[in-house]
A protein has these predicted regions:
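Accessory terminal regions of nucleic-acid processing enzymes
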Residues: 1-206
Length: 206
């Protein structure tokens, strides 16, 4: 049984939404690559949240690291351990840039509260909002994200019905009505001097 209210699951639920918003915001496309080993240090490996793969986009070839904090305040400055994580990722991927994306999502308590706040996809104060469908295959939850291009409740109802009909093996569990409270995207550059200064320690450990 999966605890869908834990902080870890919060990240699992909202990370794909963060990617959708990032792609929409920067007109790009994110590809997933799984775990990638460092060519020179096979014991080093990285699993980036994604890499920009849209060829004609200025961000092409840039890695993406996502955090969805639930309590920590977003300040635009990566914590030391996150910075180190991104440096290791860039070394394994042999990339020079990484976008550090932080998104803080809040949830409405009811559908009525969601509908009364602004229009379908924007709050009264101009923040993004939307809906996530939670479905279950009998063992674990899966999520379907209302496309950011949907702007009316009527469009949403059509999409929802089509989505549920397309997944007859899944059972609807609940809906999440969200809004994006805070978003920060900071460019982190690869620091070869730092890596070269500490890489000797890898031999001491391995």
């Amino acid at each position: 049984r999966v605890n869908i209210t834990s902080a870890m699951h919060h990240g699992h639920k909202f990370e794909p939404l963060s990617i959708l918003i990032y792609e929409n915001l920067y007109n790009t496309k994110i590809g997933e690559y799984g775990c990638i080993e460092n060519d020179d240090y096979p014991h080093l490996a990285a699993s980036p949240d994604g890499i920009n793969i849209k060829l004609d986009n200025p961000r092409y070839g840039r890695a993406l690291e996502i955090k969805n904090p639930t309590t920590r305040e977003i300040c635009g400055i990566p914590k030391k351990e996150y910075w180190v994580q991104m440096q290791m990722q860039m070394e394994c991927l042999n990339l020079d840039d990484c976008d550090f994306l932080e998104t803080a999502f809040k949830e409405y308590k009811t559908e009525d509260e969601f509908l009364k706040d602004g229009n379908f996809n924007t709050t009264k104060d101009g923040k993004r909002k939307g809906i996530i469908l939670c479905l279950n295959d009998g063992t674990k939850p899966t999520y379907e994200y209302v496309p950011l291009t949907i702007t009316t409740y009527t469009q949403y109802e059509i999409w929802r019905n089509e989505t549920i009909d397309f997944n007859p093996h899944l059972t609807w569990i609940t809906d999440t009505y969200w809004y994006l409270e805070t978003i920060s995207c900071v460019l982190v550059r690869r620091n070869k001097l730092w890596f070269n200064a500490i890489k000797h320690k890898f031999k001491e450990v391995w």
